[in-house]
Amino acid sequence: MADMAKFEEEVNKLRTLEKDREKYFTSRQEMEMRLTESKNVKAELDLMESDSKVYKLIGAVLVRQDLEEARSTVEKRLEFIDSETKRVEASISDISKKCTEQRDKVMNMQKSFQMMAQAAAQAQKK
């Protein structure tokens, strides 16, 4: 029975790792959406003339912003999103490796249980 408790513990570890991996995948999708949105904003800002008026939404109020300041802000946002995406990708890689190792561990335990069950069944036949 101690083996079965250990097995359940390992299965729960695997489930936890898989849930964490899904959170990272969701985070990556959100980053990709933010990146796309920011790239679109940058493209629009790049098309503007230097004397164009730019407004920034703060709460429910539109506030005038300098074009160069807006471009700089978007550029910094793109850099931040890029670094966060790299961090999330590294985390996904790490947790995927851990999931694979844990899945192998659980499968090996299952094989051991099956072999013990077969051995017990064979012993009963004799």
Swiss-Prot record:
Gene from which this protein is expressed: pfd-6
A molecular function GO annotation: protein-folding chaperone binding
Subunit text: Heterohexamer of two PFD-alpha type and four PFD-beta type subunits.
Source species: Caenorhabditis elegans
Disruption phenotype: Abnormal locomotion, abnormal morphology, slow growth, defects in distal tip cell migration, defects in developing gonads, and in extreme cases embryonic lethal.
GO cellular component: cytoplasm; prefoldin complex
Compartments where located: Cytoplasm
Keyword Hydrolase: no
Organs and tissues of expression: Expressed in embryonic blastomeres and gonads.
Task performed by this protein: Binds specifically to cytosolic chaperonin (c-CPN) and transfers target proteins to it. Binds to nascent polypeptide chain and promotes folding in an environment in which there are many competing pathways for nonnative proteins. Required for positioning of the mitotic spindle.
Keyword entries, A-Z: Chaperone, Cytoplasm
SUPFAM superfamilies found in the cross-reference section: Prefoldin (SSF46579)
Protein name in the entry: Probable prefoldin subunit 6
A GO BP annotation: chaperone-mediated protein complex assembly
Ribonucleoprotein is among the record's keywords: no
Family under the similarity heading: Belongs to the prefoldin subunit beta family.
Domain of life per record: Eukaryota
